[in-house]
């Protein structure tokens, strides 16, 4: 049998065995087994896996294999988030159908994932573009429509001019489309929405109890939901019929209002623009402005004076009303009472337009003067120049102003949310059709469930931008399900975040055809015990999934309130960037090192090392996982990814770290083969050895079991590996030599081999399965229980005591754990290093802390 560690041969062998024996199939008959649902966010089938995938899925696999060895019934599935714009782009560029492109990519990536030795139940695999999944999703859409959680309305939406589709607010990053990067425009369209705002309070309140989630993610969702308490009231208007309703969280600043501003989409703005070309032109420029907080902060504040005046509800002053590019129609009423002295955006606008600034809050110990302000004062203080509210603390004044407004019938206290209903209409082909029909006689009519699924047409034209379904008359034309007259099919498809909002439930019963879920199976497995994925999904996928889960609960499909009990957000994989003056970014293989300097292989020019950044094709700082696995094996790749950094921190790529992981696995390989060669009885040690060295090492071995178990339970994967490394070094030192062992030495080495392969199995499953088999075991290591520590071996007989002189470390002393304090004191004073430090001095005091230290005070 080959004595050399050959990962390529070993890994293909065990992947085949696991596949043939269906080792990781989810058990159907659970009995009284505890269940554990481990899920890593499924990937978009872009064509190839990258190092971020390798890290992500290695983390998930360690958890799944560990829980399996703990005796739990584990559900560990994989699938594909398969709808989306890239497939349409590929269709246009490469003249290939999105479906063909998608399934070809899935086939490639499936094999790449299998080469990592991941313990997936591949029998539960599905792609969200599969007919059954799309069918089931259409059924859920109709059920939520019946529940009143889906509706259609005209609304200003975020329009991506490159992808020619609508984006939800969460999909606009710094004013640009999350995928295309193009500046987003505002357009008014008829759109389908989910009533996520109906669940705003529950989504917010539940976050307080989700202790298994990172605090950063909970904070991000809290801020995104954006619950605020304020006052809603209306300004009377001069020069325009009706009133101007506003919402403010700062009623304490009411007396400092000097103008009002409205969003470009506000009805007042539209009315003014009808007869004013300059206003219409200004509104058009506003529609290209980003909608994120960051974009609005950086934006140059611009406005257009409408000529309309708002009447202050208390002072009666006339205030100018502006159309402003920094006011969002989607927040509050789309109109703002502007207080330039105490709001930075209003301050910048007032300065630019020469509008009066009134200070109405003075901080303690200071006097602010409007003409001297360089920025708005937004801190606490007492009200000034505020009529009957003058002298009040500003927090107290918020409540008093609200009470005054209600008493006077001017306005009322109200609660507002930053969160807006989720617009799911997308103007593209490669998505799930919305199962609705538009009839001239009947209006909007849902497609009966019996007529589902609505399938996408195969013959489509991608030569023009926009939605091909809109240009497909034979598909678009249908009969009204209600009256039978000619009607038009809905041509918008669903946002792809729809698919990822319930896929985790489908894994519980993936073979149900058009029936969405088997509730008994869902109740058996949900919630997901451990979810793993990137923090970039905090207010996109994770928020939508929480909402959708609650909506499905309310129509009886699920029982639990939250879908994910614990969340681990892994860090990014980063690598140095390299740049050549002539050829730009260089891949690592395009750079050569000579005499300590780097040169471009193509032109010989000097290459500079840039920032350590997230691996990306655009910066060429990527390492191909296939090359890594071909060169070192999947076990080395997995081990490095899990050892190089804590799971929730960024990992900085280091080639020497990969070599180190490879060498460590080689040492373990040789250690276990040595045990096979040298151990006579091949029986594990079950009692405490008489030999002191063996006794000490067995204590280290079993303390390592405790350490690794604790580390895996708290997901400190890198420190668990470090503990096994330290223990294996101790084993090599303890059992050095090549002679055949008998008795307690043989038993302990054999126990060491057994424990080592078990502890390493979640990290390096192929190598450890091979070693387990070579040790003569008949069962799969994947089916073997996790090792348990022997309590007797954990009892420490000796302890290391630190000796300090005047608080400074001077020596160490190993003593029996039950040694009397007087004896420890005597040994400490007799220590040669202590004698040197106390020579010629008087010992004033000796403090003995049992089991820890001795401090000698001398002068």
UniProtKB/Swiss-Prot annotation:
Domain of life: Bacteria
Gene (name only): leuS
Short sequence motif 'HIGH' region: positions: 43-53
Chain span(s) of sequence motif 'KMSKS' region: 614-618
GO cellular component assignments: cytosol
EC code: 6.1.1.4
Keyword annotations: Aminoacyl-tRNA synthetase, ATP-binding, Cytoplasm, Ligase, Nucleotide-binding, Protein biosynthesis
Xref: InterPro entries: aa-tRNA-synth_I_CS, aa-tRNA-synth_Ia, Leu-tRNA-ligase, Leu_tRNA-synth_edit, M/V/L/I-tRNA-synth_anticd-bd, Methionyl/Leucyl_tRNA_Synth, Rossmann-like_a/b/a_fold, tRNAsynth_Ia_anticodon-bd
Molecular function as annotated in GO: aminoacyl-tRNA deacylase activity; ATP binding; leucine-tRNA ligase activity
Catalytic activity: tRNA(Leu) + L-leucine + ATP = L-leucyl-tRNA(Leu) + AMP + diphosphate
The protein's name in its UniProt record: Leucine--tRNA ligase
BP GO annotations: leucyl-tRNA aminoacylation
Keyword Transport: no
Organism: Magnetococcus marinus (strain ATCC BAA-1437 / JCM 17883 / MC-1)
Taxonomic lineage: Bacteria, Pseudomonadati, Pseudomonadota, Alphaproteobacteria, Magnetococcales
Family membership noted in the UniProt record: Belongs to the class-I aminoacyl-tRNA synthetase family.
Entry-linked Gene3D superfamilies: HUPs (3.40.50.620), Isoleucyl-tRNA Synthetase, Domain 1 (1.10.730.10)
Amino acids binding ATP: 617
Principal location class: cytoplasm
């Amino acid at each position: 049998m080959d004595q050399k560690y050959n990962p390529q041969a070993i890994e293909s062998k065990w992947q085949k065995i696991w596949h043939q024996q269906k080792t990781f199939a989810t058990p159907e008959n659970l009995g009284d087994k505890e269940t554990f649902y481990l899920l890593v966010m499924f990937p978009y089938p872009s064509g190839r896996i990258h190092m971020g995938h390798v890290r992500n899925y290695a983390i998930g696999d360690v958890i799944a294999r560990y829980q399996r060895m703990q005796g739990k019934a584990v559900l560990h599935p994989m699938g594909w988030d398969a709808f989306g714009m890239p497939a349409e782009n590929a269709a246009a560029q490469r003249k290939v159908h999105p479906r063909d492109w998608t399934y070809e990519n899935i086939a490639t990536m499936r094999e790449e994932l299998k080469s990592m030795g991941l313990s997936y139940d591949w029998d539960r695999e599905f792609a969200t573009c599969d007919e059954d999944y799309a069918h089931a999703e259409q059924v859920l859409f109709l059920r939520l429509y019946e529940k009143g959680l889906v509706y259609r309305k005209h609304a200003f939406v975020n329009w991506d001019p490159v992808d020619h589709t609508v984006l939800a607010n969460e999909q606009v990053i710094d004013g640009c489309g999350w995928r295309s990067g193009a500046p987003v425009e505002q357009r008014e369209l008829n759109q389908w929405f989910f009533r996520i705002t109906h669940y705003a309070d529950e989504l917010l309140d539940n976050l307080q109890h989700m202790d298994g989630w990172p605090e950063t993610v909970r904070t991000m969702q809290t801020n995104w939901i954006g619950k605020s308490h304020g006052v809603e009231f209306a300004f009377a208007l001069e020069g325009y019929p009706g009133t101007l309703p506003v919402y403010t969280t700062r009623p304490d600043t009411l007396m400092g209002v000097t103008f009002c501003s409205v969003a470009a989409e506000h009805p007042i703005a539209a009315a003014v623009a009808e007869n004013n070309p300059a206003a219409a032109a200004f509104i058009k420029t506003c529609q290209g402005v980003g909608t994120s907080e960051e974009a609005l902060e950086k934006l140059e504040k611009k406005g257009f004076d409408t000529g309309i005046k708002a009447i202050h509800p208390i002072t009666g002053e006339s205030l100018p009303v502006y159309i402003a590019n920094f006011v969002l129609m989607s927040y509050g009423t789309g109109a703002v009472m502007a207080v330039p002295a105490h709001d930075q955006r209003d301050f910048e606008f007032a300065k630019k337009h020469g509008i009066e600034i009134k200070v109405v809050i003075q901080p303690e110990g200071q006097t602010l003067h409007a003409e001297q302000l360089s920025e708005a004062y937004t801190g606490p203080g007492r009200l000034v120049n505020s009529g009957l509210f003058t002298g009040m603390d500003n927090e107290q004044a918020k409540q008093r102003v609200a009470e005054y407004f209600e008493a006077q019938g001017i306005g009322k206290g109200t609660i507002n949310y930053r969160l807006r209903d989720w617009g799911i209409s997308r103007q593209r082909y490669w998505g799930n059709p919305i199962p609705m029909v538009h009839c001239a006689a009947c209006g909007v009519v849902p497609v009966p469930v019996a007529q589902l699924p609505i399938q996408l047409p195969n013959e489509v034209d991608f030569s023009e931008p926009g939605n091909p379904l809109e240009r497909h008359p034979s598909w678009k034309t249908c009969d009204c399900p209600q009256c039978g007259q000619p009607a038009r099919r809905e041509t918008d498809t669903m946002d792809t975040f729809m698919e990822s909002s319930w896929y985790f439930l489908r894994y519980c019963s993936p073979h149900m055809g058009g029936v969405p879920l088997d509730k008994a199976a869902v109740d058996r497995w949900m919630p997901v015990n451990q979810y793993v994925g990137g923090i970039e999904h905090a207010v996109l996928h994770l928020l939508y999934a929480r909402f959708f889960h609650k909506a499905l609960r309310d129509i009886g499909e699920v029982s639990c309130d939250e879908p994910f009990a614990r969340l681990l957000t892994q860090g990014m994989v980063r690598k140095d960037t390299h740049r050549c003056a002539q050829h730009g970014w260089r891949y690592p293989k395009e750079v050569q090192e000579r005499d300590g300097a780097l040169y471009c292989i193509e032109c010989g020019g000097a290459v500079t090392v840039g920032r350590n950044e997230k691996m990306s094709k655009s910066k060429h700082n990527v390492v191909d996982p296939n090359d890594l696995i071909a060169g070192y094996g999947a076990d080395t790749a997995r081990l490095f990814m899990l050892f190089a950094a804590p799971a929730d921190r960024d990992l900085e790529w280091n080639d020497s770290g990969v070599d180190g992981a490879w060498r460590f696995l080689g040492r373990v390989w040789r250690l276990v083969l040595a045990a096979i060669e040298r151990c006579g009885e091949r029986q594990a040690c079950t009692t405490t050895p008489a030999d002191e060295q063996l006794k000490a090492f067995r204590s280290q071995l079993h303390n390592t079991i405790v350490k690794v178990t604790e580390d895996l339970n708290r997901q400190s994967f890198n420190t668990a590996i470090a503990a096994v490394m330290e223990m294996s070094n101790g084993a090599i030192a303890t059992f050095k030599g090549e002679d055949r062992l008998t008795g307690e030495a043989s038993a302990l080495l054999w126990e060491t081999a057994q424990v080592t392969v078990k502890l390493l199995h979640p990290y390096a499953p192929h190598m450890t399965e091979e070693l387990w088999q070579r040790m003569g075991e008949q069962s799969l290591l994947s089916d073997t229980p996790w090792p348990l520590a022997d309590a007797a071996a954990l009892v420490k007989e000796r302890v290391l005591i630190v000796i300090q002189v005047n608080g400074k470390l001077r020596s160490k002393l190993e003593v029996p754990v039950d040694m009397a304090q007087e004896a420890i004191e005597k040994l400490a004073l007799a220590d040669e290093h202590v004698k040197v430090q106390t020579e010629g001095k008087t010992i004033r005091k000796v403090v003995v802390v049992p089991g820890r230290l001795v401090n000698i005070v001398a002068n």
